[in-house]
Amino acid sequence: MSSSVVSKPARYHPVSVILHWAVVLLIVAAVMFAGDDGGGNLGLHTLIGGIVLALMVIRFAMRWAVKQPAWASTGNGFLDLIGKLTHFGLYFFTFSILVTGVFLFLNGGQGSFFMGAFHSLSWFAMFLLIALHIGAAFYHQFLVRDNLMGRMWFES
């Protein structure tokens, strides 16, 4: 009887890569079209949010349907924990922004002060986590030198 070892891929599945970068670009666009002061385009902001919601549901399903690369350890337990919490936070706040956005949309922009405030505060938290995520990617790429950024790009 032989036991086979299931290895983890070295990089993310191409569909996961497309979803990741599509969501990045759409989030940038959503921020550009946001604004309560009349400077934004709420219709376009809402449409983009709906597309991001659909892509995030697919992306989340992909995490279970397709093998993921092994966690990229820094060799430091504390930094690895921060990395895991950052990824959890990115998913949590992305979905909280989307869910509160859907609530606000379904109520015609009217409704709970809490939902609007949580939508805005989630954006703020998300910006901080995005900055941390980008900083960590550069840390891995240029200090740890583990080609982490190559995992979230297409094979050359």
Predicted features, each with a name:
Residues 1-156:
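Membrane-embedded alpha-helical bundles that constitute the cytochrome b-like, heme-associated redox core
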